[in-house]
């Protein structure tokens, strides 16, 4: 079994790699076992440096590269009649400190009937769906050098 032990910031355009789909729960762990689409078992024993985001690359000591993709999983999808109503739902869910994925037209969170009832009580629609889960990292998340979603941090970031 191949054991992946390194996180890669980037790979060269001509680098060959395999892919694996992992749930959010698994992508939070530094040690796990998984199966590739081909059925081949792999293991990971990675440094504890944060969540593997969809599109992350990991490698073995021998140089084998694997791209990690977010696996579709059962989620609660929140939709609203207005953007303001969706914003209110995001506020209330954020106050409960649950992992929350934001999109322009919907919010996604892991199944929780109590939270679903709360959101429905605000007048929003909650449905179950299968979708890849990439929740927001939050204001207090570990530092990363990926500033794609944060142009302000990128402009003011200083390495000491």
UniProtKB/Swiss-Prot annotation:
Keyword Zinc-finger recorded: no
Keywords: Chaperone, Cytoplasm, Nickel
Biological process terms in GO annotation: protein folding; protein-containing complex assembly; urea metabolic process
Entries under SMART domains matching the protein: UreE_N
Stored InterPro entries: UreE, UreE_C_dom, UreE_N, UreE_N_sf
Gene3D superfamilies, A to Z: Urease metallochaperone UreE, N-terminal domain, UreE, C-terminal domain
Subcellular location: Cytoplasm
Cellular compartments per GO CC: cytoplasm
Main location: cytoplasm
GO molecular function list: nickel cation binding; unfolded protein binding
Cross-referenced HAMAP family: UreE
Similarity-based family: Belongs to the UreE family.
Annotated NCBIfam families: PRK13261.1-1
Its biological purpose: Involved in urease metallocenter assembly. Binds nickel. Probably functions as a nickel donor during metallocenter assembly.
Protein name as it appears in the record: Urease accessory protein UreE
Source organism of the structure: Acinetobacter baumannii (strain AYE)
